[in-house]
Amino acid sequence: CRRLALEGYLAIAPELYFREGDPNDFADIPTLLSGLVAKVPDSQVLADLDHVASWASRNGGDVHRLMITGFCWGGRITWLYAAHNPQLKAAVAWYGKLTGDKSLNSPKQPVDIATDLNAPVLGLYGGQDNSIPQESVETMRQALRAANAKAEIIVYPDAGHAFNADYRPSYHAESAKDGWQRMLEWFKQYGGKRN
């Protein structure tokens, strides 16, 4: 958020699973994902993001330049939100899950909504990501192509999952830097110029 704010954006990082508990209470990421994040219904998250957009529009944000980005779980949500909100102008999903099992809380995966995108989406993925197989990335590419969707997926061959997380061993500086530049260009191209 800070880095986007320094670029001139009104950037907000909402706590989208606060109703389910405190993420700080979980010892590691796998436990956090299964014990907290998986309990949050997609419909609740999308509604909360609508409320964030509404709040931003009343507090200095330009609803005509609404954009979203997210990482990992947030990357998956980014794809879903691009199909949910018709006001969205641009989206960038960083290594978000594309395919998988459906549940009551997650009735659709990004591959299921490729035909419904309201905004151009840039997907940034690691070729060495063990949690998102390249087969699922290719399945998403095919779905986007078939839908004639305005979307692009970039795969960084030497990067794994969470390659932009500079506080984790998975950080891959070259891919992270390139991905960040691509995100800024995507936002500029589709979301409009900064103030």
In which residue ranges do the predicted regions lie?
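N-terminal cap/leader regions of alpha/beta-hydrolase-fold enzymes
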Residues: 1-195
